[in-house]
């Protein structure tokens, strides 16, 4: 069976050296690659009732020409041909762009078959193909492949047809019969045939469902097997602490815990008291109380006789966290120390000696914590805040400071559940999805750029009451390519307008980290009242006095990033405001502004952002670790993702999966991916 799987594509008639080279560039090397090279779209020539067709979907209809065609020219070579078409009892508009010759083919009352994109709102079809006469039954659903250079779509169809005939029915099916039957999925051969040569929409739908599930299952199996291997290979620290002592500390806090904080805390302390190493992601919106949860977890480590570490991305954030922890542990005989690059000389030497002697219970700091000379006596808990801001190697180095300490990653970036279980699938995920009572909602408004004078008047009104403001711009300097505001121009403009009244600061990514810290210190101390910045303040410090956030060209940002920026205000007792300045051209841009104005819930926004931008853009283009699926879509197929995750967990935990022949193909996939070694899989 495997021989066919790895048979070279050169065995297919018509594939010579040049064609083989082109196919290799498309990632097609053997028969298996060829058969799993699925169409990127299907041209559906099957007649359908327009009532069933979704907006923007491609459709084929047969109808009578109901009006004389009208040809309109605009520009030198551009034109539009429009006519009315009676399809059953629907009277719709058909539009053809830049094909004036079609006018001669159309006559009032004649029957035509048209295919194109359906605009449900305008009851208009944008014609891509038009043929005189009734619909031809022999052409229903045609696959369209992504091709290049000397390989055409027709050639690709021919190559795949040969592969289906000669090899497909002898290839091993990755999905065991038991799983296929439980979800009523077709076998491998049937599914391949339906993907490449669908006879009906229903057959195609079923085949797609099978491959969606298969892709998700394989991915989740790798994740679950990785977790299993980690647990078996790394013996964690079983932390033993008194629940009564921990409850005494919790009751001493100046605020009651929310139900969500209590739930998350139970998950974390259960991990800490187990013999396995904790590897958990803690998600919580800005202001949801992650720091309090972190403090309680750190205290549990101290009660167990160990030390804890908290690593954050910036020096000023480290200082604020350290101050906050010192305040919380004031009456509890807990030693908190701060280590950043600013701690030098004798002070640094003394701190490191105390740390190695076990005299420091909690060490807070930046990447300075991972330097070689930093040694703990007994580190059992590592917490990193805004974990995606650190590289994998940095996180690994900190983890290696102890004997497999428990690790908790915290992020204020609300990550949709579908992405969290995919991108962070090897971790357990905890979510604080509830805000503390009494927290004021940030009022958010979407305005056009021509309202700048009114906005600045509103900003000044707030400044006169002793408040401060952030002004965010998408760029640092002027750009020829983008017509958007830049921070330097806005800084110069505001410095002129408010000269002698208010101090204006400037922060952007080109500043050295020391310079950024200095600017933020001045803003925190209210030495400057207006801070003009790029998105470098997205994850920043706590300035309770800042109550206004003005974002220029807000439609340039995704919802999640806008929400992170908005989270810089609303941290004190005063009412806060976020003003989105934007003149969006696209419907998606307008939709983003509307959603931002209506909701303050970060998780709801992150789900919407995922829908509008897609998974690839959610973390930014350069984000590594995002899996690429051929068929599956994490947003639209999230139910299948959940099912596959549960099935993968059950399989990996069962003896049958590692021994029974029916799971051999799935085990081979794990072996190929390098997640498990051959000994375990044999």
UniProtKB/Swiss-Prot annotation:
Residues 451-611 form the Helicase C-terminal domain. Disruption phenotype: Decreased viability with a cell proliferation defect and an increase in anucleate cells, very sensitive to DNA damaging agents 4-nitroquinoline-1-oxide, methylmethane sulfonate and mitomycin C. RecD2 is synthetically lethal with recG. Residues 46-139 are annotated as: Wedge domain. Residues 271-432 form the Helicase ATP-binding domain. ATP binds at residues 284-291. Belongs to the helicase family. RecG subfamily. This is ATP-dependent DNA helicase RecG. The lineage of its organism: Bacteria, Bacillati, Bacillota, Bacilli, Bacillales.
